[in-house]
Amino acid sequence: MKTGRNDPCPCGSGKKYKKCCANRSASSILQEMKEDIHNLIGDRSFGSIEEVQAVLDQYQQQKNEAPVEEFHGLSSEQMHRFLHLPFESPELITFPLELEREPENKAAFLLSMLIKGIGEDGMKLTAKGNLGRKFCQAAHREYYARYPDSFMANLSVRSELNFEPLHAIRLTAQLGGLVRKYKGRLLLTNKCKKALDRNGLRELYPLVLHAYIRKFNWAYRDGFQEIPFIQQSFLFTLYLLRKYGNTWRPATFYSDNYLRAFPMILEEIERKPFEEPKDTLQRCYILRALQKFAGFFGLADLEQVSEGPINREYRVRSTGLLKEVVRWSL
């Protein structure tokens, strides 16, 4: 049976075939496998085809279970589950549906403001279905008073679309079934009210986080091309933060190791006249995966180490919340 381009690569890397061995010559792949099998079998003799098959099966299993250097200790089998079954692999990771303590981060802060603003009576929306200007302006002031950014704080807010973090949270809350539109108003759903009564943000935060991972399109928040694999591989980003985030490291440390694990992703990058695909990917990954995912949801701290609002450079470390959001069994 022919391997489809979107199927897991038969080499055991955990990547899709089109992003791994699809462009390697058949002869080079076969030669590599031939050498591995020769080293495994050596001068052994076999009494049946079944014995040979058992050895080959053992070879493939060992290959799948062996740690891969580029994956920082993960095997190709584990990486496959990270990429394709992150929420269905309890032997590796679980995602608690309730936190031990009230979360304090940008996403939780905006979610709390949105829920309070909606209240029991709902919130009137604009003719275009967006949050009202006054609410957005007030939320903008409070947000940047708590999380200072001199450049973003001075931007004019005329509509919800001018306050992108709030817009992202509102959309994600809708996708997660926590709020809904009805007759020109935004209302809390019964699901949201029940979770709010039971455990407040300790239960609401995981719901929004999971909706952001599974339903929200991360590329919508920035000006880069889609590159959906960055979102699909969210768990590997968190794994790197868990493994190396106990100390401050440059954001490029994570983007470099991400590219080292998935070099074929460069083939998806649209070429630009004055920028290498590697540099485009680096900027996109740092913004999309580190700033607007891990940083926004409080799973990592990002501290700017450069001057000015253009071409910002950051250092990164993980937070205690990461250990609560993902329980690792590795």
Where are these regions (language model features)?
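Short amphipathic alpha-helical interaction segments
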Residues: 160-175, 277-297
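Short Cys/His-rich zinc-binding micro-motifs
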Residues: 1-15
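Short acidic, hydrophobic short linear motifs in intrinsically disordered regions
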Residues: 124-157, 245-279
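Charged, alpha-helix-forming regions
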Residues: 57-64, 129-133, 137, 219, ...
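Cysteine-centered loop/knuckle micro-motif
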Residues: 18-22
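Short, amphipathic alpha-helical interface elements at domain boundaries
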Residues: 39-163
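Leucine-rich, amphipathic alpha-helical/linker segments
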Residues: 82-110, 117, 200-255
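Accessory beta->alpha helical hairpin/"wing" motif in late/C-terminal subdomains of nucleic-acid enzymes
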Residues: 169, 180-219, 301-330
